[in-house]
Amino acid sequence: MERKLMSLLPSISLSEMEPNSTLGNHNSNRSCTTENFKREFYPIVYLVIFIWGALGNGFSIYVFLKPYKKSTSVNVFMLNLAISDLLFTITLPFRVDYYLRGSNXIFGDTPCRIMSYSMYVNMYSSIYFLTVLSVVRFLATVHPFRLLHTTSIKNAWILCGVIWIFIMASSTVLLKNGSEQKDNVTLCLELNSNKVTKLKTMNYVALVVGFVLPFGTLSICYLLIIRALLKVEVPESGLRLSHRKALITVIIALIIFLLCFLPYHVLRTLHLLEWKADKCKDRLHKAVAVTLALAAANSCFNPFLYYFAGENFKDRLKSALRKGRPQKTRCGFSVCVWLKKETRV
């Protein structure tokens, strides 16, 4: 019990916290479910997220890893964010198959554990990487020279390592909760009535540490950037590049938080507070199902962050795309002049 409560982040979002209809007795409650909704909704949404997330983040990783003349700490954070998204999207086909079969897992116990583990590792690592990105971008506009050493490539990798270790270590409890056999059906990703009370307490900690604090930090960064822009005399050509990138980074991060993470954390909390073994709340179950899909969709929105706010990402992208094109033949000045004369009509 104490070991589980010490796991602050994804461990609080156990697989049992996913929207489910398994209420008490399995036989009597199969009729009071959102099974049909999940069977129709999840496979389509997860398949779209898988295709776009795998292509977008896979190609982004390729662009980030291509040799380039200049690399920054921002690129390091974005690369780790893309890796987290790609690792998560790889597990989505298993979720698609599970819901297409009417919430029946056929791949065994291990994939069931990994599905829950990857979902929440991705969610909270994304939250922390987005928050760190916004803070670094904000501080770069306020103390650009003082933070030159602090935001070095080496320190960026160290910070990413700390985030990975913290999130993955606190999520290990998810690997202890696998599939469950009931009435010739192998259940996975289901809410267990025996653990609701404990999950309520754990959810509150996750809500504060995993969402409220990062979201509050993002909001403060946004307000302080606006304040800094109002104080600084903006040249006629427009915003200074560092200010513009900082503002774009925080705005996109806030949009992802508001669209993907806020609805899920609010409805997940409400779902646990309202959950009772003898009552069926189809509307709430469906709402939580939709917000869970939105949380998973964060991996589709992050590539837009790389493109619009990434450090040299557009230049890296152009360089990567030019590699496959045939190079123009170069010639000496005298030869080119001769060719021009000979081909003149």
From Swiss-Prot:
Q: Which GO terms describe its molecular function?
A: cysteinyl leukotriene receptor activity; G protein-coupled peptide receptor activity
Q: How does it sit in the membrane?
A: Multi-pass membrane protein
Q: Does the keyword Membrane apply?
A: yes
Domain of life of the organism in this record? Eukaryota
Which GO cellular component does the record give, naming just one?
plasma membrane
Extract the InterPro entries matched here: CLT2_recept, Cyst_leuk_rcpt, GPCR_Rhodpsn, GPCR_Rhodpsn_7TM
Going by the UniProt annotation, this protein carries glycans at: 20, 29, 177, 184
Cysteines engaged in disulfide bonds, as pairs: 112-188
Per the record's keyword annotation, is Glycoprotein included, yes or no?
Answer: yes
Give residue spans on the Cytoplasmic membrane side. Answer: 65-73, 146-154, 227-246, 309-345
Q: Which UniProt keywords apply?
A: Cell membrane, Disulfide bond, G-protein coupled receptor, Glycoprotein, Membrane, Receptor, Transducer, Transmembrane, Transmembrane helix
Gene Ontology BP, a term: neuropeptide signaling pathway
Query: Cellular location of this protein?
Result: Cell membrane
Segments on the Extracellular face: 1-43, 95-124, 176-205, 268-287
The record's annotation in Gene3D superfamilies points to: Rhodopsin 7-helix transmembrane proteins (1.20.1070.10)
Q: Where are the transmembrane segments?
A: 44-64, 74-94, 125-145, 155-175, 206-226, 247-267, 288-308
The job of this chain, per UniProt, is described as: Receptor for cysteinyl leukotrienes. The response is mediated via a G-protein that activates a phosphatidylinositol-calcium second messenger system.
Q: What family is it from?
A: Belongs to the G-protein coupled receptor 1 family.
Q: Tell me the protein's name.
A: Cysteinyl leukotriene receptor 2
Its organism's taxonomic lineage begins at: Eukaryota, Metazoa, Chordata, Craniata, Vertebrata
Instruction: Report the gene name.
Output: CYSLTR2
